[in-house]
């Protein structure tokens, strides 16, 4: 570290969870000096796919650092959209004794137990078809009640690590991004985590939009939010999260951040987990779509083509953008995207919460672990295998080692500065 940054300055920066590792002048590969980010796509019941992958990663971390290791202990920021936002809350919201509400291994049980009640499988018929034209397919009451019971009065600034959750405001016609970063300095953005999760899950035609208000107790100001699923703008939240982090770097909040340069994005270590898509299978043809009117664009064979297209386009464009950025920085190995573009049938839907399909989705997650590491070809948009990179499971083992080294380096730096850590949750000791 440059001599001008004393141990006192290091200790000040160690006191925050946000970007605990960014230091100018240190090599990007230096343990303890990187920004770690986990991003989780939206996809409804397909949240079982990232649930399976994240359980594998957390198990590898537990092998390295003990059974109490949780993902929130290792990531400076967890970002999620729609079902990914719900997973983000599970991983980052405080539960008993200041530890995360859910272990990653508990995520799939949540979907298996609650999926059929969130998305009850109704019989098809003329009445159901007509109803789908005039209101959302599901009333959302069970999901809303479950989220409120699970998260209680937890607000976004209370999370154990920084979170970023995109939504879309239908009144303002613009994305609204909720983050721990903003909530700490903007009281009107410090919403209940339950309201944020309900909002980011409100996929048009599937679940109702959500309205709520926040109040600034100091000024009495009130803000109203009229929100739907953030997936219409950022179904893959990777770049949104990186933008939030970079924004914090640029404002140079010296109470929270090391003095870093906005160009130091080579210090990111990013894991982006998808929920699968159908892009390699060929979903529709121009000949088919040319004959569609409003009804077919909104509902076709149990799916909502216009919504599916928006969300798939959002995810793929973000992946291409992120891949190009990391390649331009010669940091390809710092960005791992795990995605499967071969889904079909019920597995490709967001609401087929049957027992058979949910088991199949878990199997798809396991299959993705065994697949070779792939990277998007920026010319074709297709995923191609990375020669010599091994399987996604191999890559996650390596990722776990990097995360563990990062955490250990931060703990060592904190102890060297005279900090404590004994008796504290490991996530607190890591981030401080």
UniProtKB/Swiss-Prot annotation:
Protein known as: Patatin-like protein 1
Residues annotated as domain PNPLA: 38-242
Top EC class, one word: hydrolase
InterPro entries assigned to the protein according to its UniProt record, in alphabetical order: Acyl_Trfase/lysoPLipase, PNPLA_dom
Annotated SUPFAM superfamilies: FabD/lysophospholipase-like
Gene field: PLP1
Gene3D superfamilies, sorted: Cytosolic phospholipase A2 catalytic domain
Lineage: Eukaryota, Viridiplantae, Streptophyta, Embryophyta, Tracheophyta
Record keywords: Hydrolase, Lipid degradation, Lipid metabolism, Plant defense
Enzyme Commission code: 3.1.1.-
Catalytic center residues: 82 (nucleophile), 229 (proton acceptor)
One Gene Ontology term of the molecular function aspect: phospholipase activity
Motif (GXGXXG): 42-47
DGA/G (motif): residue ranges: 229-231
General function of this protein: Possesses non-specific lipolytic acyl hydrolase (LAH) activity. Hydrolyzes phospholipids as well as galactolipids. May play a role in disease resistance.
Annotated signal sequence range: none
GO biological process, one term: defense response
The record's note on its domains: The nitrogen atoms of the two glycine residues in the GGXR motif define the oxyanion hole, and stabilize the oxyanion that forms during the nucleophilic attack by the catalytic serine during substrate cleavage.
Chain ranges for the short sequence motif GXSXG as given in the UniProt record: 80-84
Similarity remark: Belongs to the patatin family.
